[in-house]
Amino acid sequence: MGALEGIRVVDVGLLVQGPQAGQTLRDLGAEVIKVELPGLGDMARWIPISMEDLRTPYFEACNRGKKSITIDLRVTEGANIFRKLVDTADVLVANFKPGTLEAWGLSYEELSKTNPGLIYAMGSTFGPEGKGADREGADLAGQAAGGLVSTTGSDGEPPTPVGATIADHIGSMNMTVGILAALFSRNVTGKGQRVDVSLLGGQIYAQASEYTAYLMTEKVPGRSNGGH
């Protein structure tokens, strides 16, 4: 029996950040229902190993063991079906561009009216407010905005991203931690809440020592040259 046995998660995440958070919750025992829009669905389905090998590791790695359903959230009938599904859930996981679910009438404020215990977890690139809130982006945008590409590699090299999708994965783990904290809080208060995480925020968290060193010295960190 997993620690999250009996918890239901509705996952409308895309690519890595949202789906990986849903995957971690699934690994901990939660029931996770993957919801995709009709047509292309989660775009991770369309990132193959190569043009010769069309298997999709991005999708498979982040969606193991989930249940799957297609609902068109953009139309009234689909949105109504989705609301009924969310009414049965403990957690909603998403990482659409900020404002997308709100435009479809699926904001936290709307969904929590009929499910006040809902944990509404939203991931983004730059956060829901302020500069960049209306911009889309994925892992490389998070690495670049957070400064990781400027400290990776050796002196004299151009900005170098980390080979793995590290911004996405840190963002997803931060989302998972936020969800678990919100579930604990709900046990105390009986109320759900909205959880917001961003790729940029995750990169700042992961490079706390570099940011602190800058605040202390006013010197921009250079290349790591393979070290820390």
PLM regions and their residue ranges:
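Acidic, glycine-rich segments within the central catalytic cores of soluble metabolic enzymes
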Residues: 145-228
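Glycine-rich beta-alpha junction loops
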Residues: 39, 125-127, 199-204
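Acyl-CoA thioester-binding alpha/beta core of soluble enzymes
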Residues: 1-39, 83, 88, 95, ...
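N-terminal Rossmann-like NAD(P) cofactor-binding subdomain of oxidoreductases
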Residues: 94-153
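A structured beta-alpha segment of the ubiquitous adenosine-cofactor-binding alpha/beta core
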Residues: 54-113
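Short, hinge-like loop/turn segments at secondary-structure boundaries
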Residues: 49-53, 136-141, 213-214
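Glycine-rich phosphate-binding loop and adjoining beta1-alpha1-beta2 segment
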Residues: 27-68
